[in-house]
C-alpha cells in the first residue's frame, strides 16, 4: 500500500500527515479556533491568511515526525472539495508545488471521503459496504460506502448541518465558539428531559415523512423562542437544561435515522465521522441503539473526528493504489456531491503514470 503525504486546508485547520498501510506515521494540525473565537465563527479571509502562514511549517513537521524523506513518499494527496475556496487554494497550491518539485503523483481528495476513511485508520480490516453517518459543521449525511470512490447518499439535512446547529444554539445561550464542545460540557449539568423540542421531520408529497433526511432549523428556532420566553419574563435562562435537551434531541434524531437506514439497507456496520462524532450524547445513544439491533458502530478517536490530514492521506493512498491520480489542472471547489468523487481522477496524468506498488 502506498505511503502518502496529505494536506488539508478546507476550513480553519492547517493540517499535514503521512500515512502508510492505513497506519498514521504523523498527523500535524495547526488549529485556528482561538483566532476565530472572537468572531463567533470562521472568517474565510482570516482562515486563508493563516493557512498561508502555517502551511510550510506544518508540512515540514509532518515529514520530520514521520521520520521519512521524499524518496519514500509515493504520492501527495490534498483536499480539493468541498470547502472554503480561498482556504482550499492554499493547500492545493502547496500540494501542486511539491508534486512538481519532487515529481510525485497528485491525488485530489473529497473532504467527506476523507471523513469516511478516518474509520479505516482505527479499523484497517473494515469491509465494504457499510453505512457512514457524517456529522460536521458543514455536512450531515447518511452515505452508503460501496467501495473506494463509490458512494450513495441515502439521507441528508435539508437546512442546517448538525454542527452548524450546535454553533447557533451555543451563540443563543452565550456559550461561545465552537459550540459543539461548549454545549456538550454544560449539558452534563442539565436535564435532557427538561424541555420537549421538535425533532424536525421532512414531509413527503405523498404523505408521511422522509425516513432518513433531517432538519435542524425548526429545532434552532424552538430554542430561540424558549430562551426569549425566559428573558421576557425576567427569569434566568436555564442554560444547562436547554443545552441538554437540545443535545438529546439532535442525538435522538441522528440515531433513529442511522439505525433505520442501516436496517433497511441490510448494512451491519455504521461508521461515524465528522466533528459532531465527538459528541458524548450521540456516542451513547447510537452505541446503545445499535447494540439492541445487533449492529456494529465505529467511532474514530476524538483526534480523527475533527478535520485532519491523516484521513485525507488514507483516502489518497486507497485511490493511488488503484491507479487513480489527478491532473495538475485540479481545481478547488466549494461544493461537490460525494457521488462525483471519481471526477477528480479523469485518468492518469501523462506526467505521472500509475505507480506499480506492491500489495503488502
Curated annotation (Swiss-Prot):
Predominant location: cytoplasm
Disulfide-bond pairs as recorded: none
Cofactor(s) essential for the protein: Fe(2+)
Cofactor note: Binds 1 Fe(2+) ion per subunit.
InterPro entries assigned: ATPase_NBD, Gcp-like_dom, KAE1/TsaD, Peptidase_M22_CS, TsaD
One Gene Ontology MF term: N(6)-L-threonylcarbamoyladenine synthase activity
Keyword Iron: yes
Binding site for substrate: 134-138, 167, 180, 184, 279
Assigned keywords, A-Z: Acyltransferase, Cytoplasm, Iron, Metal-binding, Transferase, tRNA processing
Record's catalysed reaction(s): L-threonylcarbamoyladenylate + adenosine(37) in tRNA = N(6)-L-threonylcarbamoyladenosine(37) in tRNA + AMP + H(+)
Binding sites annotated in the UniProt record for Fe cation: 111, 115, 307
EC top class, as a word: transferase
Pfam families per the UniProt record, alphabetical: TsaD
PROSITE patterns referenced in this protein's UniProt entry, alphabetically: GLYCOPROTEASE
Enzyme Commission number: 2.3.1.234
Record-stated family: Belongs to the KAE1 / TsaD family.
Purpose of the protein: Required for the formation of a threonylcarbamoyl group on adenosine at position 37 (t(6)A37) in tRNAs that read codons beginning with adenine. Is involved in the transfer of the threonylcarbamoyl moiety of threonylcarbamoyl-AMP (TC-AMP) to the N6 group of A37, together with TsaE and TsaB. TsaD likely plays a direct catalytic role in this reaction.
Designated name of the protein: tRNA N6-adenosine threonylcarbamoyltransferase
Organism of provenance: Acaryochloris marina (strain MBIC 11017)
